[in-house]
């Protein structure tokens, strides 16, 4: 018998697997007698109890049966219908690797506070009183720290009861869709976060992409869409980096106050990364009638590996939330929540945020300096966020430039990649993110960008 006695598994499991496979493959027929326990033990130089354990497992699962004073015999096990499975073409699309990345959603992976997290984990997390707690809404301690941060840094007054912890924008929006009326019609910024289309379709949400103007989402077009909610990024519109002025903010707030069942969902995307002044106040801080659902995350400020986002719900939506709360519990582990709680409680978060702002601002200035050396390029610098919008003179469609960059090992995108719905007057641009690369990599990548643009303009 070909039984491996030197494998990682216990010997009795090897014996069990050998006979099981032999029976299933028909090498041992119904009624055929197996070697006695003593005979097999002697042949294999193992203990009788080892063979007994294997035979007991085979007997328990119905492969063999014991006949008193006669031994063990193969049972009638029937057979499965023999068919040839058709292969399913479910291969993942090949993920292209790039030497340089101007991706506008990527941050600096080398600057995340890994060492500080290690120290917090070993000294505090496993001893935390919330370590074994289960809270569908997210651990109270973290919600308390977020509440304090929102009041101090973002001017938002709320309570721990209004804060919900989850693993990302998509998960939080799914909760919002469940809570809001089934007749929800959502107005979306166009261009915007294109991946939302899949989420909206999965949740059967009626939506209308609304074009932008110099102040953000066009309010008159939004009103004509007969929406019941608006999803906005007012402090740093993604991906145009447009800042919504106070007049437009008041227009949307007054619209929300004008009828019951109307809400604004504010995604405070990258709002902390403002380099010319203090961070802009969020729409939620102006909300006197509690009609703004506020969403933010720690992806760029701490690390995207945490997958930790949070939401502030208006009071009038809490009752509905508590009704469905057990079905939509937090998807963030207690370990991660306690890590971030202690990170914030110890004052590390504010220091980390200021540190990251300094790092990204230096990269922004390097990229701007490199762009100035290329004739015919005009960069729109909002002095916020983590990418620049770049126009090339004489170019209306940037598809060829992006393709050429990708062929040269540079990850990049263009404005038209982010349109949820095509617009006749849509303006295209090259989008260059500076979060993922260090300063030297930005300079090296820009030397390739310069050559490609000059070649395409010949």
Spans of features found by a protein language model:
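Residue-level detector of anion-binding/catalytic polar loops
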Residues: 206, 263, 410-411
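PLP-dependent aminotransferase class I/II
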Residues: 294-382
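Walker B catalytic acidic pair
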Residues: 267-268
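Conserved active-site segment immediately N-terminal to the catalytic lysine
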Residues: 279-298, 319-320, 430
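N-terminal basic, amphipathic alpha-helical segments
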Residues: 1-122, 131, 322, 326-333, ...
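Conserved core of the PLP fold type I
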Residues: 130-260, 272, 278-286, 290, ...
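A generic "structured core" feature
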Residues: 164, 190-199, 323, 327, ...
């Amino acid at each position: 018998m070909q039984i491996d006695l030197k494998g990682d598994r216990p010997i009795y499991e090897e014996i069990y697997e050998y006979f099981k496979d032999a029976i299933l493959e028909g090498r041992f027929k119904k009624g055929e007698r197996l070697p006695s326990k003593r005979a097999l033990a002697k042949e294999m130089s193992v203990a009788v109890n080892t063979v007994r354990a294997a035979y007991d497992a085979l007997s328990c699962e119905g492969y063999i049966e014991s006949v008193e004073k006669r031994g063990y015999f193969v049972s009638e096990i029937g057979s499965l219908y023999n068919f040839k499975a058709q292969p399913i073409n479910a291969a993942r699309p090949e993920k292209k690797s790039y030497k340089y990345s101007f991706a506008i959603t990527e941050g600096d992976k080398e600057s995340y506070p890994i060492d500080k997290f290690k120290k917090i984990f070993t000294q505090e997390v496993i001893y935390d009183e919330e370590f074994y707690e289960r809270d569908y809404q997210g651990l109270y301690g973290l919600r308390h720290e977020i509440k304090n941060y929102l009041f101090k840094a973002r001017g938002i007054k709320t309570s721990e009861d209004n804060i919900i912890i989850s693993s990302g924008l998509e998960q939080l929006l799914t909760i919002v869709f469940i809570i809001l009326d089934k007749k929800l019609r959502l107005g979306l910024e166009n261009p915007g976060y294109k991946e939302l289309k899949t989420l909206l379709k999965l949740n059967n949400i009626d939506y209308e992409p609304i074009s932008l103007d110099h102040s953000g989402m066009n309010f008159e077009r939004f009103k004509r869409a007969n929406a019941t909610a608006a999803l906005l990024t007012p402090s740093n519109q993604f991906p145009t980096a447009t800042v919504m002025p106070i007049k437009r903010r008041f227009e949307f707030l007054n619209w929300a106050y004008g009828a019951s069942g109307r809400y604004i969902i504010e995604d405070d995307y990258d709002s902390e990364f403002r380099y010319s002044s203090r961070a802009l106040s969020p729409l939620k801080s102006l909300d006197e009638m509690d009609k703004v659902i506020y969403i933010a995350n720690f992806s760029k400020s701490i690390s995207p590996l945490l997958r930790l986002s949070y939401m502030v719900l208006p009071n009038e939506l809490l009752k509905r939330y508590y009704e469905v709360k057990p079905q939509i519990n937090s998807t963030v582990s207690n370990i991660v929540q306690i890590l971030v709680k202690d990170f914030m409680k110890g004052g590390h978060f504010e220091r980390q945020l200021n540190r990251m702002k300094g790092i990204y601002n230096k990269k922004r200035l390097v990229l701007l300096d490199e762009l100035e050396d290329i004739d015919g390029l005009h960069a729109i610098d909002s002095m916020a966020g983590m990418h620049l919008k770049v126009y090339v003179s004489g170019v209306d469609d940037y598809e060829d430039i992006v393709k050429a960059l990708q062929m040269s090992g540079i990850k990049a995108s263009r404005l038209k990649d982010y349109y949820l719905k095509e617009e006749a007057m849509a303006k295209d641009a090259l989008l260059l993110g500076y979060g993922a690369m260090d300063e030297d990599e930005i300079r090296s990548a820009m030397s390739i960008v310069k050559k490609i643009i000059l070649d395409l303009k010949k």
